[in-house]
Every structure is written in C-alpha cells, then in structure tokens.
Curated annotation (Swiss-Prot):
Residues 36-54 have a biased composition (Low complexity). It comes from Homo sapiens. Required for checkpoint signaling after DNA damage. Required for ATR expression, possibly by stabilizing the protein. GO terms for biological process: DNA damage checkpoint signaling; DNA repair; nucleobase-containing compound metabolic process; regulation of double-strand break repair. The EEXXXDDL motif is required for the interaction with catalytic subunit PRKDC and its recruitment to sites of DNA damage. One of its GO terms (cellular component) is ATR-ATRIP complex. The gene is ATRIP. Belongs to the ATRIP family. This is ATR-interacting protein. A motif (EEXXXDL motif) lies at residues 769-776. Residues 15-27 have a biased composition (Pro residues). Residues 1-57 are annotated as: Disordered. Ubiquitous.
Length: 791
C-alpha cells in the first residue's frame, strides 16, 4: 500500500492547478480548497480520490467517532466489522463524486492488513499463554524444591542439634567424673598429709620423751631399739587391715626401729649426720606408715583383673616389690623433693628418703636431666602407662620373641613403654650419685661434692655415702619394675633393643649423663659401653650401673647387681636370636660380675645370661677373650675356689650344673674354641674345674644313697653324665690333657670308679657314655704308670 499511495502523495504535494469539470451547480459539493493541475499533467487513474482525495473535517470527525465507539463498546472482531461498515457507508457517500470508484479499494487493503495483524496477535497470545503455563510449571517446581530444601535443612539442623546435645552430655559426664576423681584424689592426698603430720608429731613427742628419760635417769644405759633383738614387733602395728586404721603406738613404733637400716648393714656406710640411733628413719618404718594409706590406690587397680594387663598391673602394684625392701611403685610415683622434711606437704612414703632424693636438686643443676619437672613428667607418663596397660588388649603381632625360644608368645602391651622414663630417671639418678661419690673419694674432700653442698643448702646434712645408700633402694625398685616390664611386654623388649628412646626429653637428658660418665675417670668397660651409640639410653645406664655395683660392696649393692642381671637375663630370654648381637656390649662388663667378691646368686645369673647368649654363633666365641679377663677362666676360678662362704651347698651345686650345661652347649655348637682354646689359660683350667665339679657332684649322689628319687638328684645324675662326656671330649682334643689332670689326680682317681659304676648301672646308659668311661679309666691308668716308675 505504500507503493500505491506514493504517487498520490507526490501529486498532493505539487502546487494546485485549475481543474476542468462541470460547474459548481451540478450537484457535487464544492471543494473546500481549490487544487490546480499543471497543463502537462493528466489525471491518474490509480488515484481513488482523484483531485478531490482529501478528507473533509466532517469526514475526519466521523472517523474519530467511529474509532472511539469501536474501542469502547465492541470487542476486537465486532469493532473491525463496525468500522468496516462505517467506512463502507462513508465511501458510498463519497462515491458520488467522480473519484468514488477508486476509493473503494482502500478498505479492502486495510481489512487485509488488519486480519494479518489479528492473526499475529492471536499467535503471540497463544505463545504468551504457553509461556505463562511454563512459568507456572517452573514456579511450582521451584516451590517444591524449595520446600524439599527447607525440609532437608530442618532435618539436618535437628540432627546437628541432637549430636551437639549428645556431645555436650558426654562432655559433661566426663567432666563430672573427672571432678569426682579429682576430689577423691585430693581427699586421699589430704588424708595422707594428715597422717604424715601425725607421724611427725609423734616422732617429736617420742624424741622429747626420750630426752626427758635420759635427763631423768642418766645412770641407766640406753639400749637402742635398733640394736635390741629382744624387741618383738606387734603384728597389728605392722600388718594393717582393710578398713582399719593402723596408727602405730609408741611401743610398736619403737619395735619397728629394731629392723636394720639398709645403709647400716655394711660397715663401710656411715649413718646420717646428727641422726640418733632411735630416730625412726628406716625404709621399713616408712612402708608401715604408708601401707594403709596406699591400699585404696592399689585395690582400685587390682580390681581390673578382666583385662590382659592385669597380671602386670598386679606385679607392679605389689607392696613391696622385692622381699626385704619397703619401697614399691607407689613410692616412685609419689616421690618429690619440693617439700622439706617433717612438713605435712611431704609426699607419702618419702619420710627418711628425702635426704637421698636431694640429689634431684643436685644433678638437676647440671643440665635439667633430673629436675623436678622431669620427675613429674615421668610420673605422669607412668600413670598413663597404668591406664593403658590396664585396658589394653594383648597383641602378639610383631613380637620380638616370635619364632624364638619362648614356649608361649609374649604380649605386646605397648602401654608398658610409658613406665620407662620413670625407671630411667631413678636409675640415672643413682648412677649420678655413684659418680659423685667416686669423685669425692678421689678428691678426698667429700664436703665439696655437689651432692653434699646441695643437701646442706636444703637443710638436710648428709654425705655422698648416705645419698647413694638411700638412692640404692629406689634404684632396686626401679630395676624390679623394669624386670616385670621386660617379662610381660614385648613392646618394652623391642624398644630397649632397638636403640630408640622411650621419651625424647628423658632420652636426651639421660644420654648426656652417659656421656658424662664415659668422659670421667671410668674403667675401660664403661668406656666401651659408652662408645656404642646404637643402644637405648636405659640399656646404657643399666650397663653402667652393673659395672658400678659389681665393683662395690654392700648388701644393697649386691641387690642392685642381682636386679641388673635379672633384667638382662629376662631381656635375652624374651628376645629372638636376631636381637642377641645387641648384647655384645655385655661382655665388657661381665668380667666384673665374676670376680671373687661377687655373691653366688649374681654369678649364677651371669652364667644363665651367658648360656642364653651362647645360642648365637657370633657371640659364642666371645666367651673366651684369650686374656686375663676371659669369662670362662674367671668362671672356672670362681667355681674351684668357692669364695662366697655364705652361699648354701645347693646353690653351689646349681651353679656347677649350669656351668656344665653351658660348656656342653658350647662344645656342641663350636667344637673349636672357646671350650678347647689353645692360646688361653682357660684351656688348662677347664680340666681342673670339670674334675672338681665331677667330684663334688659324685659326693652329693653318694651321700644321698640309692637310686635318684627327687628332681634335684636326677639333675645331679644328669650333670654327672654330661661332665663325663665333656671330659672325654677334652681328652680326645687336648694333647696335654694328661698334664692338666696332674693337679687334681687324686680327685680323678677317687671319683672315676664310682661314677663309672653309677652310670653303667643306669637303665638308659648309651654306647657313647660307656665308651667315654672306658677311655677315661684307661687315661687314669696311663697317668698312674709314670708315678709308679718314678717311685
């Protein structure tokens, strides 16, 4: 339509021109504005309006009226029809002029455009309805998802709230239990402090009354209760019962003092400076004082017998740990050097041992290795170990004794490792005190020693001997604890032989102690031990203590030596053969343990340790060092001389039997040295020692009379048979066997006929034994013939 209307519009824009036609009086309305045409222009047949194409004002007003009525009264379709009708009427009226026919085509085109627009409108309206429906669907889905999300969030929030409440309840319950246990512990501590204060008050009254008695009756000689054997200890004062207060009376307290103090069993130890004979400072008195107070602590642990570590717990909490000693694990856990002597704050069971524990302040001044904080840390670890062992399951994975020599597998019990820092602390403290004592003896001025100066500064006058004497009790207790740990915990055995420290702080401190000990004036054995950097610090200290105790004398020193050897024996017994080379450093210390001054029980333990170490092919040849310190030579000399006059005959027989079986094991495993070494004096002494042992064993069987009936008699007969086989083996391998028998020829002549008759009369005698008897009897005749010719 735009192309159609363009010419018309172009013509309308031209200037008007006169138009030919009929005059105005012909009936057509005159044009409102005259239009003129150019002379060259011709009428356009396509123009529907012609020269009179413009609407009049009435026409425009009528169109506006129709449009407004159509918009306000009729719907879209009716509005279109009405407007079309009005337009037709208008156009019919206008068709009376000459150009009316051309104008009739305009409404048709407009109607077509209107229909197209209406179709587009309907299509867009349908699309809009579809979009609205999709929007409604999406809104519904969004609402559903939002509701589901809210519901899930509410569920999660409820679960989170319930979990938080549950955790809060658990925390509150644990806090309540902790407060309850703390109150109980404070109550027990207060009770112990109260009892301790009462004991101190009773001591003061007792001393006052004794001084008054001395002043009132100076002519009466005072007999110390400690030296009076006629005093009888009342059992009700020494053995408290559960639920009964065991507070000692004056008589029972004096009777308890008749027990000898460990420091005064040997003349080489001096009493504490300013201490009276009647002063109740013995360890036995302290144990009687605490036994009732610590019973509840012990019973609470022993009730947990349903766990795998109950056996170890019961052994550790036994009071006392060692017969003849008054100390236990409770003393090590409650020991401290903070409180001065005689105050209510003094820890339970400390009593007279405060002077010895003053070494804490002494050695702690060096590098903090034995400070009070280190002791508290070790005690806290030990308490943790008690809890872990009490509730730990017995695991046998990775057992160092697995596939080894134990009949039953060893439990791991890794919680037992937490006891090692406490044991290491007291053993290291004892080693430090021994070093101070040695330095004081070398300098000749014991008053200048660090231990002595610290004790004087702390208000307790004592000397290094007293400190060492008191610390020996704690060291023996720590060694006993270590023995139980090694016997029942595979984790402890693995840790001690692995070279890794149990506690970093304690390990570093004790490692510095080992270096101080090795840098001083020590023996070559101690220097050899300190040079091995792959050892566990506690194992190093154990070897140092073994060397110290084997060189000293005294009852407690013998106990320390025995406990050290027991720990080493159990450690070697519970480990596998692969770990036995770790014991190579023990050969440097064992010669001191076989000296004539060593008690027989310690020598017996040393032989048992050697028998265990001989199972390894690398360690067996080291029993003979081809020098004066040869272990076999020292052992032969100890057996033949029998220096321990206190030991029983049965103990000597047991030692001889263990030595015979050790030599039999060495002879089977290595037919060459050490049993028949040609360059060592032990090659000469072995014939003499075996002959002496054969004679003694034979006399024992002869005194018993008849066939063997008891286990001990059967062991003796077994030892006789093994000794005969050993002597026969030596006679076959040693060319100088005849010369070596000359010194014990009378014993050899006396014992061989009886031994031959005894062994041949046994029902299970073997051909080897009969052949050995024949050869030895023939050798006896060969030895006698030269003497007859000389005669």
């Amino acid at each position: 339509m735009a192309g159609t209307s363009a010419p018309g519009s172009k013509r309308r824009s031209e200037p008007p021109a006169p138009r030919p036609g009929p005059p105005p009086g012909t009936g057509h309305p005159p044009s409102k504005r005259a239009r003129g045409f150019s002379a060259a222009a011709a009428p356009d047949p396509d123009d529907p309006f012609g020269a009179h194409g413009d609407f009049t004002a009435d026409d425009l007003e009528e169109l506006d009226t129709l449009a407004s009525q159509a918009l306000s009264q009729c719907p879209a379709a009716a509005r279109d029809v009405s407007s079309d009708h009005k337009v037709h009427r208008l156009l019919d009226g206008m068709s009376k002029n000459p150009s009316g026919k051309n104008r009739e085509t305009v409404p048709i085109k407009d109607n077509f455009e209107l229909e197209v627009l209406q179709a587009q409108y309907k299509e867009l309206k349908e699309k809009m309805k579809v979009m609205e429906e999709e929007v409604l669907i999406k809104n519904g889905e969004i609402k559903i998802l939002r509701d589901s999300l809210h519901q899930t969030e509410s569920v999660l929030e409820e679960q989170r709230r319930s979990h938080f409440l549950l955790e809060q309840e658990k925390t509150q319950a644990l806090s309540d239990k902790e407060k309850e246990f703390s109150k109980k512990l404070q109550s027990l501590q207060s009770e112990l402090q109260f009892k301790d204060a009462e004991m101190n008050e009773l001591r003061t009254k007792l001393q006052t009354s004794e001084r008054a008695n001395k002043l009132a009756a100076p002519s009466v000689s005072h007999v110390s209760p400690r030296k009076n054997p006629s005093v009888v200890i009342k059992p009700e004062a020494c053995s408290p019962q559960f639920g009964k207060t065991s507070f000692p009376t004056k008589e029972s307290f004096s009777a308890n003092m008749s027990l000898p103090h460990p420091c005064q069993t040997e003349s080489g130890y001096k009493p504490l400076v300013g201490r009276e004979d009647s002063k109740p400072h013995s360890l036995r008195g302290d144990s009687i004082k605490q036994e009732e107070a610590q019973k509840s602590f012990v019973d609470s642990w022993r009730q947990r017998s349903n766990t795998q570590g109950s056996i170890l717990i019961n052994l550790l909490l036994k009071q006392p740990l060692i017969p003849g000693s008054s100390l236990s694990l409770c003393h090590l856990l409650s020991s401290s050097s903070e409180s001065p002597a005689g105050t209510p704050l003094q820890p339970p069971g400390f009593g007279s041992t405060l002077a010895g524990m003053s070494g804490l302040r002494t050695t702690g001044s060096y590098d903090g290795s034995f400070s009070l904080s280190a002791l508290r840390e070790a005690q806290n670890l030990a308490f943790t170990g008690l809890n872990l062992v009490a509730r730990n399951e017995c695991s046998r994975d990775g057992d160092p004794a697995e596939g080894g020599r134990r009949a039953f597998p060893l439990c791991q019990l890794p919680g037992a490792v937490h006891f090692l820092p406490l044991v290491q602390f007291f053993i290291g403290l004892h080693c430090q005190a021994l070093q101070d004592l040695a330095a004081a003896k070398r300098s000749g001025a014991p008053g200048d020693s660090p231990t002595h100066s610290s004790c004087v500064s702390s208000g307790v006058e004592t000397n290094p001997e007293d400190s060492v004497c008191i610390l020996e009790g704690f060291s023996v207790t720590a060694l006993s604890i270590l023995q139980h740990l090694v016997c029942h915990s595979g984790a402890v055995v693995s840790l001690l032989l692995s070279g890794v420290g149990a506690d970093s702080a304690a390990g570093e401190g004790n490692r510095s102690l080992v270096h101080r000990l090795s840098d001083g004036d020590m023996t070559s054995a101690l220097r050899g031990v300190a040079d091995d950097q792959g050892q566990h610090p506690l194992l190093k200290m154990l070897l140092h203590l073994l060397a110290f105790s084997s060189a000293a004398t005294g009852h407690l020193q013998a106990s320390v030596l025995t406990q050290c050897l027991k720990v080493l024996v159990k450690l070697a017994e519970n480990t596998s053969c692969d770990f036995l080379p770790r014991f190579q450093c023990v050969f440097q210390v064992l010669p001191k343990c076989l000296s004539p001054e060593t008690p027989l029980p310690s020598v017996l333990l040393a032989v048992e340790l050697l028998s265990l170490l001989a199972d390894h092919d690398q360690l067996a040849p080291q029993l003979c060092s081809h020098s004066e310190g040869c272990l076999l030579l020292l052992l032969y000399m100890y057996i033949t001389s029998r220096p321990d006059r206190v030991a029983l005959e049965t103990q000597w027989l047991q030692l001889e039997q263990e030595v015979v079986w050790l030599l039999a094991k060495l002879g089977v495993q290595s037919p060459l040295p050490p049993v028949t070494g040609s360059n060592c004096q032990c090659n000469v002494e072995v014939v003499r020692a075996l002959t002496v042992m054969l004679h003694r064993q034979w006399l024992t069987v002869r005194r018993a009379g008849g066939p063997p009936r008891t286990d001990q008699q059967r062991r003796t007969v077994r030892c006789l048979r093994d000794t005969v086989l050993l002597l026969h083996g030596l006679s076959q391998k040693d060319k100088l066997f005849m010369m070596h028998c000359v010194e014990v020829l009378h014993q050899f002549d006396q014992v061989m006929p009886g031994v031959s008759m005894l062994i041949r009369g046994l029902p299970d005698v073997t051909d080897c034994e009969e052949a050995a008897l024949d050869d030895l009897c023939a050798a006896e005749t060969d030895v006698e013939d030269p003497e007859v010719e000389c005669g």
